[in-house]
Curated annotation (Swiss-Prot):
GO molecular function: DNA binding; excinuclease ABC activity
Assembly description: Interacts with UvrB in an incision complex.
Major localisation: cytoplasm
SMART domains: GIYc, HhH1
Protein name, UniProt field: UvrABC system protein C
Organism: Actinobacillus pleuropneumoniae serotype 5b (strain L20)
Domain spans labelled GIY-YIG: 13-91
Superkingdom per UniProt: Bacteria
Length: 610
């Protein structure tokens, strides 16, 4: 039993971070404090603040502390520990994806494109946008308003004539000389920059001046082009909310919390424009109060993933934060500019946006609660069907290939809350006869299970997408395993599609019962199985398509001896891309600079037989 009195005797009155461990030496909670002794002493009073704290203290085996120079340093260290260890009793932000941006590259003829990840590519970044769909929508709009290129560099460098985008007025064709000047292209790039910075008025003023100049020079075709561009920009302005006050860069956060489930909704405003919104559902330990949730979420959201996220000038939230000043100081240091946090007395247009965020948070939470109810119903139905007391982990396998080529196996994982995408796996299947799905399934199962597994990674159910043959092969594979964990624990279930391969007509083959089950189409258990099976199928197909595309590309030029990067580029440039190379005659290939007659014959023969 943990001796709190002896431990507290040696804890100093200094700022720092503490880590609480259970009997398995697993970190179950991470916290910080201005005064470690006072904070840690509060856990061992006779009357504790909440049931959550009681449960936490009951599981403490030992505590470690780290003294820091300041509360600010403690705040950073705390969130690093939380991100690394994902403690059971901390509020955890489950979303760990980087956010997409719009990138304006630093080329002679800049390209505008979407970008996600660390900002290593030279250029100007605009965002972040809440999702890839918002970026695509903005890029489509920009292409209609400003005709600058969005194509890949490899495509741009190998053009000998303008592409379709030029023909329909969506690009100035900078890839080919003689169509537009560098100055004209630079002008459109500058308009894109102004538009993305929220300076729509300057864009219109600039275009009006250009239109008037063209009219004075009697270049009525150019004047008409500028007129159409002005009308398009103004049409966009009319659809967007125009604020009476300058909003600049800010995030507006509202939290809705019911029945142990929280929704944090964020509106992203950049350069005075709302780029979009997004809802988050952090993992919240039982009996967590709202103030702790607000403090922890804001810290995690901006500190744990700051390398991929732009920290705005201001953060507005509808919950009081206990450490506003300390958090603002840390964020300012991380962002390289002053960051203010407002958690009260919000007025003007900002209050309108905060109300909008609150409405969205409550609506998203209501929907999530309904979905959770449906998920629980499906799980309860499946437990009853299979006569299982509990289902902690389910895995499902599927095989995908084209005529036996580029075979890929997938494994998806579900728990009682739905998909565990961080545990999804794909396996490249090699060394088997093409189209042998049984051998492919065996190889996938061996790759995943023929090794030591932690107790929590052992599935309760393994679904095999296939009939009796696939299931029997899976059973044989499990029998052959020589592992330390209990290989008899997983229940293997085959999911056969039926004669007409229609959803709702599946047959379940239960390994331990040696019997088939036909469920009615409205069965909640069947709906859960279909969801898992479809997720596995989609995961396998996605992996297979990537592998097939890679094989298709490499079957062209990369695999031919004597064709390096320069010759490959010359072939693509002179023959009009890969399709042109494949359609070219021997004489046409030989006419490409740097390609000898002998090499042309090798290229021609390889492509004809690939």
């Amino acid at each position: 039993m943990f001796d709190a009195k002896a431990f507290l005797a040696d804890v100093p009155h200094l700022p720092g971070v503490y880590r609480m461990y259970d009997a398995k030496n697993t970190i179950i909670y991470v916290g910080k404090a201005k005064d470690l002794k006072k904070r840690l002493s509060s856990y061992f009073r006779s009357q504790l603040a909440s049931k959550k704290t009681e449960a936490l203290v009951a599981n403490i085996h030992h505590i470690e502390t780290t003294i820091t120079h300041s509360e600010t340093e403690a705040l950073l260290l705390e969130h690093n520990y939380i991100k690394e260890n994902q403690p059971k009793y901390n509020v955890l932000l489950r979303d760990d994806k980087s956010y997409p941006y719009i990138l304006l590259t630093k080329h002679q003829h800049p390209r505008i494109t979407s970008f996600r990840g660390s900002k290593k590519v030279a250029g100007e970044y605009f965002g972040p946008y809440p999702n890839a769909g918002a970026v695509r929508e903005t890029l489509n709009l920009l292409q209609k308003l400003f005709p600058i290129r969005q194509c890949e560099d490899s495509y741009y460098k190998n053009r000998s004539r303008p592409c379709l985008q030029y023909q329909i007025g969506r690009c100035l064709a900078p890839c080919v000389e003689g169509y537009y000047s560098q100055a004209e292209y630079d002008n459109q790039v500058n308009l894109v920059r102004l538009f993305l910075q929220g300076k729509d008025g300057q864009v219109v003023e600039h275009l009006v001046q250009k239109m008037e100049n063209a009219a004075q020079e009697l270049d009525f075709e150019a004047a008409a082009r500028f007129r159409d561009q002005i009308q398009s920009v103004r049409a966009v302005q009319e659809k967007q909310f125009v604020s009476n006050e300058r909003l600049d860069d800010l995030d507006i956060i509202s939290i809705a919390y019911q029945h142990g489930i929280a929704c944090v909704h964020i509106l992203f405003v950049r350069h005075g424009k709302v780029l979009g919104n997004r809802s988050y559902f952090p993992k919240v330990p039982n009996n967590t109060d709202l103030s702790e949730l607000a403090d922890t979420f804001v810290g995690q959201f901006y500190l744990q993933m700051n390398q991929h996220r732009t920290i705005p000038n201001q953060i507005i939230i509808d919950q009081s934060l206990s450490e506003v000043t300390a958090l603002a100081n840390v964020l300012s240091e991380q962002a390289g500019h002053k960051v203010s946090i407002a958690d009260k007395n919000i007025r003007g247009d900002k209050s309108r946006y905060l109300a909008l965020a609150k409405t969205n948070a409550e609506a998203a939470l209501t929907l999530q609660l309904k979905q959770d109810t449906h998920i629980r119903q499906r799980y309860d139905s499946l437990k009853a069907l299979l006569n299982l007391a509990e289902i902690k982990r389910m895995e499902c396998f599927d095989i995908s290939h084209t005529m036996g080529n580029q075979t890929v196996a997938s494994c998806v994982v579900f728990d009682k809350n739905g998909p565990l995408k961080s545990d999804y796996r794909r396996f490249n299947i090699e060394g088997i006869t093409g189209g042998d799905d049984y051998a492919a399934m065996e190889q996938a199962l061996l790759k995943l299970y023929d090794r030591n597994l932690e107790e929590e990674k052992i599935p309760d159910i393994i679904f095999i997408d296939g009939g009796k043959g696939q299931l029997n092969r899976a059973l044989e594979t499990f029998t052959s395993l020589n592992v330390s964990w209990d290989k008899r624990k997983p229940l293997l279930v085959g999911v056969a599609k039926g004669v007409e391969r229609k959803a709702g007509l599946e047959t379940l083959l239960i390994s331990k019962w040696d019997k088939e089950i036909h469920l009615p189409p409205d069965s909640p258990a069947l709906h859960l199985i279909q969801h898992i099976r479809d997720e596995s199928h989609n995961h396998a197909i996605t992996g297979h398509r990537k592998k097939r595309q890679k094989a298709f590309t490499e079957s062209g030029l990369e695999s031919i001896a004597g064709v390096g990067a320069k010759r490959r580029q010359a072939l693509l440039k002179y023959l009009g891309g890969m399709q042109g190379v494949k359609a070219a005659t021997l004489e046409e290939i030989q006419s490409v600079p740097g390609i000898s007659k002998q090499l042309a014959e090798v290229i021609f023969d390889t492509l004809q037989h690939s």
